[in-house]
Amino acid sequence: MDVFLGLSEDAIHRVVWTDELLDEWERVIIRERRRSPETAASVTAAIREFFADGRIDRNQYDHLIDEMPGKDRDDRPHMAAAIAARADALVTSNTADFPAAPLAALGLRVVGPDIYLNELLDDHPQEVIATIVRIAAEKTRPPKTPADILNALRGAGLREFPDRAQERL
């Protein structure tokens, strides 16, 4: 999450979000014990505060939800919001639940985080590396290095991007 938000802070890409998406992220991250309830709540509160311009209100996409493809009805609001926001890509680790071809016909590309970050690295190599270095420098408790940031991405399941970014450090 830090890297995606940092890239948005540095204007390398734009993060769009909904209240529903942040609420779901918070529930999942707590359930999977990847963050404490307090830490998860502080992350979503920070996104709401610092990335308020990326918020897509329910009334902007509600009318699209029933038209969205896919078996999982819980994912349809995310697709509808991305389309309403005119997002270039819907980045998810769960690409199987987001039918690529029907969404592409609606102008939305579904892509996993490893591929997406690799594309950003190809298009903006210096900026992406500078963001990773900045994020690491801002971590003080405990201190982190850029390699630590990339190792955290490996731990989150990214395979190629951390190695490619490490080569550029």
Named regions from a protein language model:
Residues 1-33:
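PIN/NYN-family metal-dependent endoribonuclease catalytic core
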Residues 12, 52-55, 107:
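A generic structural signal for alpha->beta connector loops
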Residues 16, 57, 111:
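General small-molecule cofactor/ligand-binding pocket signal
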Residues 22-24, 62-67, 116-120:
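A short acidic, often aromatic-flanked loop/helix-cap motif at beta-alpha or helix-coil junctions
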Residues 27-52, 125-134, 138-139:
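Extended, non-globular alpha-helical segments
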Residues 52-89, 143, 155-169:
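Active-site neighborhoods of divalent-metal-dependent phosphate/nucleic-acid chemistry enzymes
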Residues 76-109:
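Acidic, metal-binding active-site segment of PIN/NYN-like and related structure-specific nucleases
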Residues 96-169:
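Acidic, PIN/NYN-like endoribonuclease modules and their adjacent C-terminal/linker elements
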